Swiss-Prot record:
Basic and acidic residues: bias regions: 1-12
Protein name: Histone H2A.V
GO biological process: chromatin organization; heterochromatin formation
GO MF term set: DNA binding; molecular adaptor activity; protein heterodimerization activity; structural constituent of chromatin
Natural source organism: Homo sapiens (Human)
PROSITE patterns: HISTONE_H2A (PS00046)
GO cellular component, one term: extracellular exosome
Residues modified to N6-lactoyllysine: K12, K14, K116
Keywords from the named record: Acetylation, Chromosome, DNA-binding, Nucleosome core, Nucleus, Ubl conjugation
Alphabetized Pfam families for the sequence: Histone, Histone_H2A_C
Main location: nucleus
Subcellular localization: Nucleus; Chromosome
Amino acid sequence: MAGGKAGKDSGKAKAKAVSRSQRAGLQFPVGRIHRHLKTRTTSHGRVGATAAVYSAAILEYLTAEVLELAGNASKDLKVKRITPRHLQLAIRGDEELDSLIKATIAGGGVIPHIHKSLIGKKGQQKTA
């Protein structure tokens, strides 16, 4: 009896481990996000268990939102692969995502826009 717990659980089958992501019903890894939150805070501070679940849920929701809009953009252009251009069109086309994501997307191109003052009136012709 060197281990101390030899006869305690001998008859019971061990329960299968359930990850925190599965408990929360998420696809994003709650454990990994919790680890990164702990190491990235000042002086390796304390992070509550629910903070990682909440952060994972937010990241999963935002990712699903961007991918849905980018998928719609690629479908409109009749292609089956999402490119950085489709991500750019999706993010800049949505007002809330545009204000949230200020990053430059490599290979995203530019958003077509002509200022109203530059558009001439119908019937008005420039004479040279």
